[in-house]
């Protein structure tokens, strides 16, 4: 597994990271053993970057990772950890964005406790509180670095203009955005701005929430998952179209002797040297399969073929439901 630099300070992380949302029950029931098996498999494959967040299972993802570190002595030093804060939950499960200094400080300290660590490499604001100036939030994050609790800071789902403002206050280590063959929105500004300020673009949902895998979720499966049951791309008639058009992509991957997931990851890695995809999975077999994308060198003609099969805008339906769009910053 090759490495890439995280942010301006050059921390070396694997070119493929591991998304920790799957360590909660977001994509189906997951237990601690599954999580620990995935973490061990990641180390065996050379994957050393874990991305998690409080909101993933209300701390459950972080807790399971922390339990792994406690159980497996020396494993903590082998991983480069990122987590996130800024989304507050109420007694009845309601959510709101809170980027205040007091709340972010409290969230970070609780994350460190669950992870059983004294410091994380990267701390993101998961969603921006629109009413609070991003300059103020960036200043808060910078203080966590000075306190030694965080090595680098980042933001998830912000616009290029917000990123530009933040970068003038303190160096931004990473930006997290959904980016894949099915969602190419970052190419309209955030990819260029991240390159300009030397921030890493961490791509979540790099497999199109299953559409770019060998076995995309059918409507029955999608309706059992809270994240997908209202997602326009996984509602009919959009889903049938999206599965049909990606069939040719699966055939191309098969002809190349790799899985569709590996090809989707390889494509992303070819889009920029500062891009690090963070797929999530509950299967060690799937992790091994997609990790092979790091070994694939795509020729110009292969990249052209992929663009013909899945041209920009091919996916029917928005990437988020109306409710899910509350928080991410739209631009362009």
What would you call each of these model-derived segments?
Residues 1, 196, 224-251, 255, ...:
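Terminal-tail/helix-coil boundary detector
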Residues 13-17, 48-49, 78-82, 119-122, ...:
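Structural preference for beta-strand elements that scaffold enzyme active sites
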Residues 21-23, 53-55, 84-88, 125-128, ...:
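Active-site beta-loop-alpha junctions enriched in small/polar residues
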Residues 91-182, 189, 200:
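Glycine/proline-rich, positively charged
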Residues 186-224, 259:
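Aromatic-lined glycan-binding groove of carbohydrate-active enzymes
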């Amino acid at each position: 597994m090759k490495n890439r630099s995280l942010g301006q300070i050059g921390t070396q992380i694997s070119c493929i990271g591991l998304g920790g949302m799957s360590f909660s029950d977001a994509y189906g029931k997951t237990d601690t053993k599954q999580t620990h098996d995935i973490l061990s498999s990641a180390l065996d494959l050379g994957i050393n970057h874990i991305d998690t967040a409080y909101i993933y299972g209300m701390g459950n993802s972080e807790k399971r990772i922390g339990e792994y570190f406690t159980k497996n002595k020396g494993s903590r030093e082998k991983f480069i950890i990122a987590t996130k804060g800024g989304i507050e939950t109420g007694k009845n499960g309601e959510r709101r964005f809170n980027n205040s200094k007091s709340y972010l400080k409290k969230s970070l300290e609780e994350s460190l406790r669950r992870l059983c660590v004294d410091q994380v490499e990267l701390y993101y604001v998961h969603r921006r509180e629109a009413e609070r100036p991003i300059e103020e939030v960036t200043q808060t994050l910078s203080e966590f670095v000075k306190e030694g609790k965080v090595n680098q800071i980042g933001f998830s789902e912000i616009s290029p203009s917000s990123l530009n403002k933040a970068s003038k206050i303190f160096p931004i280590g990473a930006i997290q955005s959904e980016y894949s063959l099915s969602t190419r929105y970052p190419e309209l500004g955030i990819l260029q701005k991240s390159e300009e300020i030397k921030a890493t673009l961490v791509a979540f949902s790099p497999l199109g929430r299953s559409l770019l895998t060998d076995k995309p979720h059918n409507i029955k499966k999608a309706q059992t998952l809270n994240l997908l049951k209202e997602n326009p791309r996984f509602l009919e008639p959009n889903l049938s179209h999206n599965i049909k058009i990606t069939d040719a992509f699966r055939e191309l991957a098969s002809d190349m002797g790799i899985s569709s997931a590996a090809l989707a990851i390889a494509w992303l890695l070819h889009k920029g040297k500062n891009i690090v995809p963070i797929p999530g999975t509950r299967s060690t077999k799937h992790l091994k399969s997609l990790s092979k994308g790091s070994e694939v060198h795509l020729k110009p003609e292969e990249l052209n073929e992929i663009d013909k099969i899945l041209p920009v805008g091919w996916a029917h339906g928005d990437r988020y439901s109306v409710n899910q769009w509350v928080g991410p910053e739209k631009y362009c």
